[in-house]
UniProtKB/Swiss-Prot annotation:
Residues 133-158 are annotated as: Disordered. It comes from Chelativorans sp. (strain BNC1). The lineage of its organism: Bacteria, Pseudomonadati, Pseudomonadota, Alphaproteobacteria, Hyphomicrobiales. This is Urease accessory protein UreE. It comes from the Bacteria. Residues 141-158 have a biased composition (Basic and acidic residues). Belongs to the UreE family. The gene is ureE. CDD domains: UreE (cd00571).
Amino acid sequence: MIRATSVTAKFDRAFDTITLDETARHRRRMMMRSDNGIEFLLDLPEARLLNHGDGLLLEDGRVIEVRALPEPLYEVRGRDSRHLLALAWQIGNRHLPAEIAEDRILIRRDHVIRDMLEGLGAMVTDITAPFSPEGGAYQAHSHDGHSHHQGHTHDHHD
């Protein structure tokens, strides 16, 4: 069984593609099948979100490009930027995955949340789009046996 052991953003041409929703794109180790039927084992050192456009590097050097499957979502808009920030706070307070842009927030469909947001004056529209929610504050990646939270950097000295 061929394995994909790393993710790359730099590749000239993909051998194949794999189209996955957001939940299926957050993996470490799993049997997968490409869009054209190639079976492979995703075998990464740690769990991570595979982003649209990432390449899964197979052991033989071929690359399978990740595509984000459009999902049923809500597009949430506020009256102005202050209102959108307040809506983002409400969404975050409920620990909901959210993709945040300057003028809108995307969340998974949930009629209870929709009712709440509309009750707060939000404009909520049903859409179908790829979903790439923000990483959490405690989501970290590791280097050389220790970890850094996103946004934290420093030099390493021997």
